[in-house]
Amino acid sequence: MPKLIPVADALSQPFWDAVNQRRLLLQHCAACDRLQYPPQQACQVCNSANGLAWKEVDGRGHIATCIVIEDGRLNRRMPDQPYNLAMVTLDADPRVNFYSNLPGTPPYQAPVGAAVEVTFEEVAPNQLIHEWRVAG
């Protein structure tokens, strides 16, 4: 399945640098002790900008919900239909969610509630992306 190649900006560059090192790095707000993704200029909860720092997290979570895309409108993805689109909740902070196609999991077979772990996939020379796979 073709993947989009990320284009980092000043705000997201630390995240993508960590991904290229096979690490998961998220913003952490010291003011309210919350992780957040995607990166933003200020905390999504308390609006603090001064308290944001990058923190490495364990790449474990679980599938909160999943749908199967059968009739998507993105031309780039049409040949891959049907495919999974899962919402993964991070174990380190259940307020943080990621979306994943769950590589290796056939459509209609995503086990909601199952443990997942982050994995990294090369989409261009020297450019990785993060994905989530069912653990085990």
Model features per residue range: what roles?
Residues 37, 51-53:
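Short functional micro-motifs and their immediate structural scaffolds
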Residues 93, 98-136:
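Well-ordered alpha/beta subsegment
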Residues 41-46, 54-62:
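Short cysteine/histidine-rich zinc-coordinating motifs and their immediately flanking basic loops
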Residues 1-24, 133-135:
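A broadly conserved sequence feature marking short terminus-proximal activation segments
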Residues 28-31, 42-48:
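Short, cysteine/histidine-rich loop/knuckle motifs that typically chelate Zn2+
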Residues 63-104:
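Glycine-rich active-site loops that engage anionic ligands at enzyme catalytic sites
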Residues 32-36:
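A structural feature recognizing the 12-helix transmembrane core of secondary solute carriers
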Residues 23-26, 40:
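Residues immediately within or flanking Cys/His clusters that coordinate Zn2+
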